[in-house]
Curated annotation (Swiss-Prot):
GO terms for cellular component: cytoplasm. The active site is at residues 145, 169, 235, 238, 261, 270. It comes from Xylella fastidiosa (strain Temecula1 / ATCC 700964). This is Tyrosine recombinase XerC. It comes from the Bacteria. Its main location: cytoplasm. Pfam families: Phage_int_SAM_1, Phage_integrase. InterPro entries: CB, DNA_brk_join_enz, Integrase-like_cat_sf, Integrase_catalytic, Integrase_recombinase_N, Integrase_SAM-like_N, Recomb_XerC, Tyrosine_recombinase_XerC/XerD. Forms a cyclic heterotetrameric complex composed of two molecules of XerC and two molecules of XerD. CDD domains: INT_XerDC_C (cd00798). Signal peptide: none annotated. It is found in: Cytoplasm. GO terms for molecular function: DNA binding; tyrosine-based site-specific recombinase activity.
Length: 294
């Protein structure tokens, strides 16, 4: 990759505080543009014009890339060219105004309240059981992102006040309440593990923070062990937290703050889940819900 591309990634990491996960996605997206440019012999990516970028998007679409992936790929390219304009390397952003096909937004799958409670209540008669119980309870209690949970240290938890402090997307810090069941599980796990303030709450095999992949695999194993029909994954617990909280409170802004969403439109998807639930209740209970008018 060119020096300018590497400088752009350094800018995203240092000045924008972009996580390594998002940065890797940007690298793949910009890398795809560079690879396409090499195949088409169109020259350096910094010199591409609007028509060439549109041809790139069309080629990716024909290759079978989903609308969501195309939108993300175009967003990365748009950000790169915006940065080039601001740094004075090019005069016009060739990606400005380009649009990818709209993605159909799927509603997130969730556990209902009974399923969620049943899932997190695993036996705690072993050290691994204590860890897993604390991990699941905290996930469902506070709606953390997977990356936030993996990176959590003991000094980010205030067990007396019942609060957890995490560094979310864009290096935005937020403080989220921790429920009583999660606090109890965390206290037991703390007493068993003996972790210091600077130590990860959930250490991996070699003492560092547990990996996202390890959590994904463990949650899948626990769900299968309980005979759950649904494919349970870490983000499902976050989705369930948000949906159940919104269902009980109706406070969209409050749920937005707890989830750490910068844009409330991201949170609004849970209102559709809530409406979906209410529609099912209505259809099942109302005497005239499914009857045809005479």
């Amino acid at each position: 990759m060119s020096r300018l591309v590497e400088d752009f990634f350094a800018f995203l990491h240092v000045e924008r505080g972009m996580s390594s996960h998002t940065l890797d996605a940007y690298r793949r997206d910009i890398g795809a543009l560079i690879a396409w440019g090499g195949q088409q012999a169109v020259g350096e990516v910094v010199a591409l014009d609007r028509a060439q970028l549109q041809a790139f998007v069309s080629a990716e679409h024909r290759r079978g890339l989903s609308a969501k992936s195309l939108q993300r790929r175009l967003s990365a390219c748009r950000g790169f060219y915006t940065w080039l304009v601001k740094r004075g390397h090019i005069a016009v952003n060739p990606a400005a105004g380009l649009r990818a096909p709209k993605a159909l937004r799927k509603l997130p799958r969730i556990l209902d309240a009974d399923e969620a409670v049943s899932f997190v209540q695993i036996p705690t008669d072993t050290p691994l059981g204590l860890r897993d119980r604390a991990l699941l309870e905290l996930f469902y209690s506070s709606g953390l992102r997977l990356s936030e949970l993996c990176g959590l240290r003991w000094d980010g938890l205030d067990l007396d006040a019942g609060l957890v402090s995490v560094l979310g997307k864009g290096s935005r810090q937020r403080v989220v309440p921790v429920g009583s069941y999660a606090l109890s599980a965390l206290r037991e796990w703390c007493a068993s593990s003996g972790g210091g303030a600077q130590q990860p709450v959930f250490p991996g095999r070699y003492g560092g923070p547990i990996s996202a992949r390890a959590v994904q695999v463990r949650i899948k194993q626990l769900a299968q062990r309980q005979g759950m029909a649904k494919h349970v994954h870490p983000h499902m617990l976050r989705h369930s937290f948000a949906s159940h909280l919104l269902e009980s409170s109706g406070d969209l802004r409050g749920v937005q703050e707890l989830l750490g969403h910068a844009d409330i439109t991201t949170t609004q998807i849970y209102t559709h889940l809530d409406f979906q639930y209410l529609s099912k209740v209505y259809d099942a209970a109302h005497p005239r819900a499914r009857r045809k008018a005479r």
